[in-house]
């Protein structure tokens, strides 16, 4: 993920990130988790600005002021991974920086809840409460999830809860 983030530049197509990810996967001798999963054609998801998640890499050209979420999964020794990184390109508006920071903080709030006996709803509550207390809303149609021998496993972790 770090190498993909560093590779991401203004003026490139999101398809170039996909190609770079394929090259890196070959270099590290891992297989893509996403390619072919439910018909997905890429090895990474490249969601730019208003695109929420799971966007297909293509001809979209990255511009000054864009934010891009790069979501990547690999299979290593029979186990899947799934992680994402957000890259801010060029001159980012203050309100966009604040938004990205708030989302990162919400992840940290959720992770801080994890301990034996805590329910996934408690984790989601911490995430959702932080987001909503900052004037944003949570996309309710998407959740976090476990990984293992399969790409999507239990537990499901919502971004809101009680």
What are these regions (language model features)?
Residues 1-162:
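Active-site neighborhoods and metal-handling regions in enzymes and metal-associated proteins
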